[in-house]
Each structure stands twice: as structure tokens, then as C-alpha cells.
Amino acid sequence: MSTKVLIISKVRTHPVKMGNNKAILAQAEMLKDLDCVVDYLYVQEMGLHGDVKENEVSYQQTKDYWGDHFLFLKVSKIEKFCKNLIAKYRKVFCGRHEGTYDPYPWQLTQYVKQLQKERGYDICLVQYYCLTKLFKKVRFNKMACFTHDAMAYKNLLVDENCPWINADQEARALQQCTDIFAIQEEEKDYFHILSPKSRVYNIYTPYSYKSTPYVGNKTLLFLSGNNGFNQNGLQWFIESVFPLIREKFSDAQLLIAGGICNVIKGKYDNISGIRLMGYVKDPMDLYELGDVAINPVYQGTGLKIKTFESISFDKVTLVHPHSVAGIYKKETAPLFVSDKPEEWVAYLERIWSDKATIMKIKEENQKYIESMNEFIVDEYKRFLAD
């Protein structure tokens, strides 16, 4: 008999534009590949002044994908209004220190309790720590949380005034779980300390390897969303590294694609050698244009998406040291890692004059992605068997 799994998320799976969309969808598909029957409960919490049309489109795309396995719970405007008041109070009087379960939907426990009575799920898998409150009232054979990120003291981790919780709050939330999914190695170790009686798995996110031909130009590629960490990393590269590259290689180009183009338009696109491509429907539209990709991001937590993505698209990949934290087999990953601009230039000088080395790195890219994907499958098999 197939294992029955209920995934609960306040994040939709479609359209797949952000890292968390991709991670949740990949998790669901992995469980289905391992013969689980997976239902998806989408808890929709719209802003009071949000884009109704955009939410309707994403809702419909998610519902169409899941079909008969789609479940839905909508947070009311009254509840959202109250949550906004709480958030303002936390901001003014608590330095944005949140309550552990401030985001928890009021109707979720009763709704899932009825679902469990009717359907009898073996596993419940919630997305993010703030939904683990459910497990205080509704029981399953396995009660799991896909953390996506380490949340404690996030304001200090990213050096920004953002909502945060402390380690005790995060520990108490995760201790409601029998099983915890981390998205990188360092966070796996951290969660095991917070919740020593829980089983902790490191699942990264699987990537498909896509072979790309050797191009032979002097083009650097950067595909990114528009969050502040990505903007800061790109600014560091453009101000500290790219001028040195252009001094050495007057024909060097930086191609930038993705949502980040919307927020940097007019800031960098007038700099010689930089071109903004905007939104690309298929990442291959960017990655087929050069041999080298960069990830200069030096802030943030969680999965290093751009690092893995660049390897999976068969690129020679240059990264800031922050962007290898916790990745699969960090010491042997096919990456150039440095925070020193002159070392980036020296490496490019060597790579751009040596096709054989580029082709060797491409071989290593394929082996790395295949090895990581095998590891991920084994982690899920271990989760289902434990």
C-alpha cells in the first residue's frame, strides 16, 4: 500500500519562479517518484492590498498541476488584518522580534484534523517552522518540517532590520517534529542541536544536468531574482571585480538576466560591457551564451541556488565564499571560490585561454550533479524507511 502524504504550505508551487517554489515542487515530485500518494494543501494568505489577478493566476496554475490532490484553505481578510496589527506591534515595540507562531493560520488545525479523520495520512509535511504548531493537536506517524532556512537571529545573519526569532523559539517549533528536512549541510547540523530527538535529513534540491557546448567568448553570466542580497552581491562584483576584468579583457561582457533587471535598470546598464536581458523564459536562453557564470552573493542563508544552477547548466562557476556554505561536497565541488577581486581576474585569465580546462570542468559538473541527486534520493528513502 502506498504511503499517504499531506504537504501543507503557505507558498504555492506554481509558477516556479522562486527557490522555495522549486524546492517544494521538487520535494513533492521526489515523494511521488518513491510511490507515495501526495496531497497538497495550499494555505492562501493574500495581502489586504495585494495583486488579486496575480494571486488568481498562481492559484489556478497550482490547482491545475495538483488536480484531484489539491486542497485549499484561505486566510480571511479579518485574520490578515489582525496579523498585520501584530506585525506592526512587533516592529514598533519588539524590534521586529516575532512570536513563534504569529504567522500560523487560525483555521488550519481544525481543517487538518478533519482531513486526517477522513483520509488517514501517514505523513504530514509542513513548509517552514511556523506551521509546526499543527503537530501539537493533530498526530501523524511522521510529522515533518521542511525548514527551507535557519530563521533564528536572521537580522544578525543578514545584517538587516528584518523579522526574526531566537534559537529557543526555533528549537521549540522544531521539537514538535519527528523529522526535519534541512536544505544544506551546516543547517542540518544546527537543527540536530536544536531538536536532538528528531531525525534530520539534508535534501538540498535536485537539479537536472544540462550539457552546453563550449562557446569560447569572454562573457560572464548572472541569472538572479530581485531580492536585496542578490543586488548587494552584484553591486560588489560590478564595483570591485568587473572593472579589473575589463582592464585585462577589453571585450569582456557581463550578461544579467532575471527579475533583478527590473530593479537595477538605469543603474548599471549604461556601464560599458554590461547588458541586461530581463526576464528569460528558459534559463538556457542565458546559459548558452557563455562558458562562465558567477555567484557573487555574500549574504543570506539557506540553499545556494545560483551556485547549483550554474553547475547544472554546465558552466565554469566563480563564487564568493559565502555562496558555497553548506553545499554538497564543498571541498571537491567544481567551483572557483574567492572574495579577492584580483584572484577572480587571475582565474579568468587562465580559464579563458585554456579550452581543455573548461572541458574538464564540464565533465566534473556532470559527475557532481549526478552524485548530489543520488544522495538526495537516498535521504528520502531513509526518511520513508526510518
Positions of predicted regions on the chain:
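Donor nucleotide-sugar binding/catalytic pocket of nucleotide-sugar-dependent glycosyltransferases
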Residues: 144, 171, 175-211
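Membrane-proximal helix-turn-helix segments that form the acceptor-binding/catalytic region
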Residues: 26, 107-114, 145, 151, ...
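Conserved acidic donor-binding segment of nucleotide-sugar-dependent glycosyltransferases
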Residues: 334-342, 350-355
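Acidic donor-binding loop of glycosyltransferase active sites
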Residues: 288-302, 313-315
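Active-site proximal beta-strand in glycosyltransferases
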Residues: 138-156
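Short hydrophobic beta-strand element within catalytic cores of glycosyltransferases
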Residues: 306-309, 316-320
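Conserved catalytic-core segment of nucleotide-activated headgroup transferases in glycan assembly
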Residues: 202-270, 276, 280-281, 288
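A charged, aromatic-enriched C-terminal amphipathic alpha-helix characteristic of glycosyltransferases
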Residues: 353-385
